[in-house]
C-alpha cells in the first residue's frame, strides 16, 4: 500500500503540467546555410556510390509508408527518410499518454494527457556524417536591421540534444535516412522523457520496452511505444508500463501573425523578450493563444464589409467513441455553443463537433485531430489544454480530457445548489436531461480553455445578487454569470417561489466579447497595425459585463469580486440566501437519498451531507475575502478609474458579523442533525475511506477560517488601509476586538464554556500563537496546507485551474500574475499585525487568570492550559 501511495503521489502533479499552455519558444535563426543545395552537382565519388548502394539495400526488404517522412521498417528496426527540404524547418515534438496502468489512472493521469512538448529543427553535419537535432529555445524578438540583432543571435543559442548516424542517402541526395529505434524504445530520452515528466524520476527498462508502430501522415509522423520502468522503495518494487505516442509535427513555414495580449481580456499568452536599438529598456511581447481563424481568400472583401462568412479552416472537435451514448449530444451542444461567439466575430460554422464512428476515415493517431477523450477514472475533473505553435501562439490542436467521475461532482452541485427550487434534483439518480444540461456547460467551459481563454472569476460579480432571483432577468441573460469561464455553477441564490427557470451557466456577454477580441480578422500584416483597432474595440466594452479578473488563491483572495464558486455582487447577501436554501435541504437528506433498494447503506446520505457542508464552507470564504479586501481594476492612463480601492468599512464589518454568526457560533442547523445520527462524513484518503464526525469537520472549518482571517498578508492589507483611509478603514484592532467578544464572550460573562466553545477558544488562541511566533507559523502553515477536510474535498473541477495557477507563477510560460505585496520579513518585524496579536494574547491571559476560580473542572483545566500556552509562546516564566 505504501508503494502504491508513493507512485500515486509522484504522478499526480503531472496533470498540472498537461493543462499548461506550451512553453514559449521562438525560432533560432538557421545556423546551417543550405544554399549549397543549389550548386551544380559534382561527379559522384566512390563513397557516394556506396551510400546509394546502402540506400538500396536498406529499402529493398523494408515495409515502407509514405508521408512527411518515409518510414522504413526492417524487422524490428525503424528508419526515417528525411527530405533535405525539411532541414532547418521548425518541428514540434508532441508526447501523449495512450494507455496507463492503475497507479496512474487513480492519480488522474490518463489516456490523452500531453506530458511533454518541445520545438526542434534538424541540421546535416557533413563533417561528421551525422544528422543533428537542435532544441529551439525562446529567442527574443529583434529587427534584423538593428545592430543588436547580432547580439541576440550570439547570446541565445539553442542546444543540440541528439545526433543520428546517417545510414544512407537516396539516389538524388534529396533525403537522408536515420535509424530511430533509440529515441522511441526508451534508450534515449532527448525527445521523449515520459517517466521524468510524470514525476517518477526513473528510466525505461530496455528489455521491457518496445516500439509498437510508427505511422507517417502528410505533416507529421507518430511513433507509439510501450515503455516500462521500475519504482523501488525499500524491498518493494512496482513495475509501471505506459503506452505513449510521440509525434513530430511540421510547423507552418510562415508563422501565423500574432495578436497582442491585453490585461482587460483573459487569454493564455506566449511571452517573448523583445530587443531593439531604439530601446532604453527591454520589453516583453505577449501574443495571445488562438486558432488560425481567417476568411477564405474569395470571402475577405465581404467579411471586411461586415458580412458573416465561413472560415477557411473551421475548428473541429471529435468526441471519443468511449463516451457514453447518452452524453454525446450534450457534449456536442456544449462544444458548438461557442458558435454564437464566433458569429459575433463574423464567422459562421466556425466550430463543429463530430462523433467518432467506425465508418469514419479518421486516424486519431494523426496529431492534427482535436479529440475529447473520455477516461474511465475515479478522478472528478475535466480539462481543456491546447497544442501551440510557440512562435506565434497559434493553437494547432486541442485535447479535452474528460474524467468519468466528474459526473459525481456535477450531480452534487445540482442537488445542493438547486434542490430547493428544482424537484427533479432531489434524487440519487438524476434525469438524463438534468445531468445533460450540466455536462453541456462543463464541456463548454473546457472548450473555452481550448480556444485560448483563461478563467474569468469576475463573471459572476457582473450579475447583481437580487437579479438572480428574478425570472425575467435570468431568462433574458440565460446564465448565472456573464462568462462561462468563471467558476459560477448553478443558481443557489434563487429561493422557492421566485419562479426562476434558468439555473445553470451558459455562454455570456464577456465570452462573446473575448472571442471577438481574439478572433475577429482585420486583414493587417503586423500586430502593430492592429493595436489602435483593438484599443477602440476595448474602449467600447467598459460595462461590468465585460470585466475580467484572473483566478485567486481561495484562502487569501484579495479582490472579493473575483472568486471561485460564487454568485452575485454581494458576498454576504448571496451567502445568506445560499444558507437559507441549505437549511431547507438538511432535514431532507435522508429522504432524498433513500432509493428503496434492499440493504441500502447511508453512504449516499453521507455524500450529500458532506456536499452541503462543503457548500456552506464555500460561502464562508466568499465573505471572508471582504475583510482586508481590495478592488483591483485593469486600468489605463486617462480612464479616470482607480487601480486599487479598499473594500468599504461597512462591508468588512458586516462580513465579520456574518462569520461570527455562521461559523464562529455553533451552527446547530448544520451539525445537530438527524442524518448525523446515522452516518458520519465519509472522506477518501490515500490509505482508504475515513469516517469523520460532523463536529470534527466543524472544528477543522473554524480553525482554517481563523488561520486565514488572521494571516499576516490579510492584516497587513488592513494596516495599509488604515494608513491610507484613517478612521474610514476597518482596522486590525477592531477586527480583534470583535473576535474576542464573540469567542470569549461566555468567559467574559462568567459563564462556563461548553466543549465546542472551548475548542473554538483554543482554535483562536492557536491562530494567534503560531502567528506571534513567526518562524513557527510558517512551518505550521505549510504543514496544515493539505489538511483541510473541506477545501481538499472541494478541489475545483477543471485541471486548467491548477495548471493556470502553476503557469502564472512561471513568467516564461504565461506571463506574471498581479501580486500585491504587503508582506516580507523586515515588514513583519515592524508590523502592527504581530503587535496586535500579542496584545490580544495578553488580554486573553488576563481574562483567564481572573476566571481560574471557576467551579467547573473542565473549564479550569482549559484556562490553565491556555495560560501555559501563552506563557510558553511569549517566553513568560
Label every model-predicted segment.
Residues 15-24:
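C-terminal segment of classical bacterial N-terminal signal peptides
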Residues 29-79, 83-323, 341, 350, ...:
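Auxiliary tRNA-acceptor-end handling modules of aminoacyl-tRNA synthetases
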Residues 81, 113, 282, 321, ...:
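Soluble non-cytosolic domains of exported or imported proteins
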Amino acid at each position: 500500500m505504501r508503494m502504491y501511495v508513493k507512485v500515486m503521489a509522484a504522478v499526480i502533479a503531472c496533470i498540472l503540467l498537461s493543462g499548461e499552455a506550451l512553453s514559449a519558444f521562438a525560432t533560432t535563426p538557421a545556423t546551417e546555410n543550405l544554399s549549397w543545395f543549389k550548386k551544380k552537382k559534382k561527379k559522384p565519388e566512390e563513397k557516394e556510390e556506396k551510400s546509394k548502394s546502402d540506400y538500396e539495400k536498406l529499402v529493398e526488404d523494408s515495409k515502407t509508408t509514405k508521408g512527411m517522412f518515409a518510414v522504413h521498417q526492417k524487422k524490428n528496426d525503424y528508419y526515417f527518410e528525411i527530405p533535405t527540404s525539411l532541414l532547418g524547418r521548425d518541428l514540434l515534438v508532441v508526447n501523449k499518454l495512450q494507455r496507463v496502468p492503475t497507479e496512474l489512472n487513480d492519480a488522474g493521469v490518463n489516456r490523452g494527457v500531453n506530458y511533454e512538448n518541445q520545438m526542434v529543427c534538424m541540421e546535416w553535419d557533413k563533417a561528421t556524417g551525422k544528422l543533428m537535432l537542435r532544441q529551439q529555445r525562446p529567442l527574443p524578438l529583434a529587427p534584423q536591421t538593428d545592430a543588436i540583432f547580432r547580439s541576440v543571435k550570439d547570446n541565445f543559442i539553442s542546444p543540440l540534444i541528439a545526433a543520428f548516424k546517417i545510414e544512407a542517402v537516396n539516389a538524388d541526395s534529396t533525403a537522408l535516412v536515420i535509424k530511430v529505434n533509440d529515441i522511441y524504445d526508451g534508450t534515449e530520452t532527448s525527445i521523449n522523457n515520459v517517466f521524468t515528466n510524470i514525476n517518477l524520476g526513473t528510466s525505461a527498462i530496455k528489455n521491457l520496452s518496445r516500439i509498437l508502430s510508427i505511422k507517417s501522415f502528410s505533416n507529421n509522423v507518430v511513433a507509439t511505444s510501450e515503455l516500462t520502468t521500475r519504482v523501488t522503495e525499500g524491498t518493494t518494487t512496482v513495475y509501471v508500463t505506459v503506452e505513449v505516442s510521440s509525434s513530430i509535427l511540421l510547423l507552418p513555414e510562415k508563422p501565423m501573425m500574432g495578436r497582442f495580449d491585453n490585461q482587460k481580456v483573459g487569454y493564455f499568452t506566449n511571452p517573448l523578450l523583445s530587443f531593439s536599438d531604439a530601446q532604453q529598456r527591454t520589453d516583453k511581447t505577449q501574443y495571445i493563444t488562438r486558432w488560425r481563424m481567417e476568411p477564405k481568400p474569395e470571402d475577405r472583401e465581404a467579411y471586411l464589409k461586415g458580412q458573416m462568412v465561413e472560415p477557411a479552416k473551421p475548428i473541429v472537435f471529435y468526441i471519443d467513441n468511449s463516451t457514453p451514448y447518452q452524453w454525446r449530444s450534450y457534449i456536442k451542444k456544449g462544444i458548438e455553443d461557442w458558435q454564437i461567439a464566433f458569429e459575433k466575430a463574423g464567422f459562421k460554422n466556425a466550430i463543429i463537433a463530430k462523433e467518432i464512428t467506425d465508418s469514419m476515415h479518421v486516424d486519431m493517431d494523426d496529431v492534427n485531430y482535436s479529440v475529447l477523450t473520455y477516461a474511465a477514472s475515479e478522478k472528478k475533473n475535466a480539462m481543456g489544454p491546447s497544442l501551440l505553435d510557440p512562435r506565434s501562439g497559434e493553437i494547432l490542436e486541442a485535447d479535452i480530457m474528460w474524467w468519468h467521475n466528474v459526473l459525481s461532482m456535477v450531480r452534487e452541485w445540482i442537488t445542493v445548489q438547486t434542490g430547493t427550487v428544482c424537484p427533479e434534483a432531489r434524487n440519487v439518480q438524476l434525469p438524463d436531461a438534468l445531468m445533460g444540461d450540466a455536462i453541456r456547460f462543463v464541456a463548454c467551459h473546457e472548450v473555452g480553455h481550448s480556444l485560448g481563454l483563461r478563467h474569468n472569476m469576475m463573471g459572476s460579480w457582473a450579475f447583481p445578487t437580487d437579479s438572480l432571483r428574478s425570472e425575467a432577468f435570468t431568462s433574458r441573460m440565460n446564465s448565472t454569470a456573464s462568462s462561462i469561464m468563471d467558476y459560477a455553477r448553478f443558481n443557489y441564490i434563487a429561493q422557492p417561489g421566485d419562479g426562476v427557470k434558468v439555473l445553470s451557466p451558459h455562454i455570456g456577454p464577456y465570452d462573446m466579447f473575448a472571442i471577438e477580441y481574439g478572433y475577429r480578422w482585420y486583414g493587417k500584416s503586423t500586430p502593430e497595425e492592429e493595436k489602435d483597432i483593438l484599443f477602440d474595440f476595448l474602449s467600447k466594452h467598459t460595462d461590468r459585463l465585460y470585466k475580467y479578473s484572473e483566478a485567486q488563491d481561495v484562502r487569501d483572495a484579495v479582490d472579493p469580486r473575483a472568486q471561485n464558486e460564487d454568485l452575485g455582487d454581494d458576498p454576504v447577501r448571496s451567502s445568506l440566501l445560499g444558507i437559507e436554501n441549505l437549511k431547507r435541504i438538511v432535514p431532507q437528506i435522508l429522504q432524498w437519498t433513500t432509493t428503496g433498494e434492499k440493504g441500502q447503506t447511508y453512504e449516499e446520505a453521507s455524500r450529500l451531507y458532506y456536499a452541503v457542508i462543503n457548500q456552506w464552507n464555500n460561502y464562508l470564504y466568499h465573505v471572508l475575502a471582504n475583510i482586508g479586501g481590495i478592488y483591483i481594476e485593469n486600468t489605463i492612463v486617462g480612464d479616470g478609474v482607480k487601480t486599487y480601492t479598499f473594500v468599504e468599512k461597512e462591508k468588512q464589518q458586516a462580513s465579520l458579523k456574518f462569520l461570527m454568526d455562521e461559523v464562529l457560533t455553533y451552527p446547530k442547523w448544520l451539525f445537530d442533525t438527524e442524518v448525523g445520527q446515522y452516518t458520519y462524513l465519509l472522506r477518501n484518503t490515500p490509505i482508504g475511506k475515513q469516517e469523520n464526525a460532523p463536529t470534527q469537520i466543524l472544528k477543522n472549518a473554524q480553525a482554517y477560517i481563523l488561520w486565514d482571517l488572521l494571516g499576516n498578508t490579510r492584516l497587513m492589507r488592513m494596516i495599509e488601509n488604515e494608513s491610507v483611509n484613517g478612521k474610514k478603514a476597518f482596522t486590525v484592532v477592531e477586527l480583534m476586538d470583535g473576535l474576542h467578544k464573540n469567542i470569549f464572550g461566555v468567559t467574559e460573562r462568567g459563564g462556563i464554556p461548553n466543549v465546542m466553545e472551548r475548542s473554538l477558544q483554543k482554535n483562536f488562541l492557536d491562530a494567534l500563537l503560531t502567528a506571534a511566533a513567526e518562524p513557527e507559523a510558517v512551518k505550521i502553515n505549510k504543514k496544515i496546507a493539505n489538511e483541510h477536510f473541506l477545501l481538499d474535498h472541494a478541489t475545483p473541477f477543471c485541471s486548467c485551474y491548477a495548471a493556470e495557477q502553476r503557469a502564472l507563477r512561471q513568467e516564461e510560460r504565461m506571463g506574471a500574475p498581479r501580486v500585491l505585496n504587503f508582506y516580507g520579513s523586515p515588514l513583519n518585524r515592524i508590523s502592527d499585525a504581530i503587535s496586535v496579536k500579542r496584545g490580544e494574547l495578553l488580554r486573553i491571559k488576563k481574562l483567564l487568570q481572573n476566571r481560574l476560580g471557576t467551579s467547573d473542572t473542565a473549564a479550569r483545566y482549559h484556562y490553565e492550559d491556555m495560560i501555559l500556552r501563552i506563557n510558553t509562546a511569549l517566553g513568560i516564566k
